[in-house]
Amino acid sequence: MSSSSLKINLQATPTGLGAWRVSFLSLTLAALVTACGGGTSTTAALDPSAPGVTPLPITPPVVNPNTSTTVTPGVYTALLSGKEVTSIVMRNSSTNSASAQLYALQFSAPFDPDIYAGSLSGIGSNSATISNLTYFQNVSGTLRTGSASLTVPSAGLLKTTVSYSATPTEGARDLTWFANPDNRLKLDTPALLETIEGKWVGRWSYAYGYIDNFSLTVSDTGVVSSSMTFQSDCQISNGSVSPALGGVNLFSVSFAVPNATQCFVRSQNLTGVAYVTSSPASGKTQRLQWIATTADGRGVSFRADR
């Protein structure tokens, strides 16, 4: 196939909030992109229809992402090529209100995601940009760098566009998705340690593999610990969670990994975000989502229901 761009248009609703409507042409083009190597491909999810979860009222000064026409902190969800995409925008500066961090999980399989991360400039305006976006691919562990932009084409709709230049082994890539706020998260509820405190058991994903029934414990003071290892000898050390900046219902997370022969993040510090929503799983009431990355973008994710 030539290196000309292909564009795939999908009509989508956010994850768990509605059904996909995909045209036959979209499916045909998706098959062509899968079958042909090289070149630049553009995959786009169109403006999703109204979500099926009623938005909860938001108390100022927290900005309501359902009614805002600017890029604001929060959790946003969509479906792309039939798979979940979750984006988290979190302030990272107490002095610069326009600065934030983006973390995003793109699931190409039911459970284990690719991880995007980067510093945002332009929060509070209609458009924010990332010049240092990293893309850590599940399974292969390939790390790529690129750029991204976040815009709000209409109230309650976050458009994310990411771009990567070609490498010797991979073609250039442009990817766009539209997402709605995750209304299972009461954004203006204070991020209290008592919400995240306790034992969580779920799926720990780290690109080269995963662990089901991974156990993580958060103390009443925000200390995070686990007796389990991943990738043979990666161990969580000096873990902590604390309320994020801006009074939103997000947590800042961090932990260190000691030096270990087989560990892909050995001798590294990881930082990221966590949040607790209502759980869609039968018999469960809470869901924890956790993402943490190294300075260069390699990372892990953890999802647990209790």
Regions found by a protein language model. Give the residues of each.
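Tryptophan-anchored aromatic micro-motifs
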Residues: 50-87, 158-210, 285-304
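N-terminal accessory/assembly segment that mediates macromolecular interactions
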Residues: 82-176
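An anionic, turn-rich surface loop/hairpin at beta-sheet edges
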Residues: 130-146, 251-272
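Hydrophilic extracytoplasmic domains
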Residues: 261-306
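N-terminal glycine/threonine-rich, aromatic-flanked beta-hairpin/loop signature
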Residues: 66, 72-126, 202-258
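Bacterial Sec-dependent N-terminal signal peptides
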Residues: 2-12, 25-73, 184-185, 303-306
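Extended lipid/amphipathic-ligand handling interfaces
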Residues: 90-91, 118-121, 148-152, 183, ...
